Amino acid sequence: MLSGQAAIVGIGATDFSKNSGRSELRLAAEAVLDALADAGLSPTDVDGLTTFTMDTNTEIAVARAAGIGELTFFSKIHYGGGAACATVQHAAMAVATGVADVVVAYRAFNERSGMRFGQVQTRLTENADSTGVDNSFSYPHGLSTPAAQVAMIARRYMHLSGATSRDFGAVSVADRKHAANNPKAYFYGKPITIEDHQNSRWIAEPLRLLDCCQETDGAVAIVVTSAARARDLKQRPVVIEAAAQGCSPDQYTMVSYYRPELDGLPEMGLVGRQLWAQSGLTPADVQTAVLYDHFTPFTLIQLEELGFCGKGEAKDFIADGAIEVGGRLPINTHGGQLGEAYIHGMNGIAEGVRQLRGTSVNPVAGVEHVLVTAGTGVPTSGLILG
């Protein structure tokens, strides 16, 4: 079993901005070198790299740019933000099996000044592959942006659970409260109120502007090695207690509308069941969580799928500041993708590490285990760190 075999020993990042002024390759190299410095390692110690299929920087290009030599392991993982925790899982599997000694997971993009994921891309319906076929079912009906695609599920969830726009807003308020205290966050010093959320414009009903993650230029990198080697390095090792991927039946990318139920994220439920089984833990053992928050409704649904509360009960679970620092389950203490930066979930993994190191700007008392999730609405992944 993978649990306890590998550890995160370094985290690194660029600044988070709306216009980096650098190439995506330079961003990747900067983050990788920053993470290695944090770990007390050099580029020549690295023999593995892993990233997203959506990343424009190949492993060999990053290796050249960062001064990394021979690679015995390299991989790319599909499904956008769903790959985030899986990059760490693959790195952990590589070092646990002896395929590599030190693996760096990275994600870099100019997602605001360059390719913007929220724009309509009609070319996706023209691809002569399975992606083109899938998109041809949803695009003609106006479901052509991530916000519109999530709005369909959010509306059904509201109907069945009784959740309201104000419940979604509670996630945004909590994230921005945490970001306001984080000098690295784009929205540092800029908290919001629930009234601000309710007054923000519609993007795709029932999603308002403040239900949607920001767009960011930047990069994050994570260094993974064996638990044995980690004990001799610079930082307190953060052990990978569990790591999982999940794809549910009848799965699509953001448009899984043909299942018996439209108000859940069963792929995240599958990830959760694996995480609890691998780690031997339960939701009650987790002191803080980093839940992928590209759109607020999916944060509520994740709480249910992961077992923190029953189906349809997330609106009550999060009430009265329960997901803020000092509450029963603080989430996204860095500010999340709504408040800190949208780096496809990789910055959330880094925050999990900081909580366990005791270096988070919004520390949660007595942290022993942190749950982190990757992108939702797609085949996804998750981690428990300790």
UniProtKB/Swiss-Prot annotation:
Keywords, alphabetical: Cholesterol metabolism, Lipid metabolism, Lyase, Steroid metabolism, Sterol metabolism
Name listed for the protein in its UniProt record: 17-hydroxy-3-oxo-4-pregnene-20-carboxyl-CoA lyase
Stored InterPro entries: Thiolase, Thiolase-like, Thiolase_C_2, Thiolase_N
Alphabetical GO biological process terms: cholesterol catabolic process
Subunit relationships: Homodimer. Interacts with the ChsH1/ChsH2 hydratase via the DUF35 C-terminal region of ChsH2 (ChsH2-DUF35). The ChsH1-ChsH2-Ltp2 protein complex is composed of two protomers that form a heterohexameric structure through the Ltp2 dimerization interface.
The protein's Enzyme Commission number: 4.1.3.-
Keyword Lipid metabolism assigned: yes
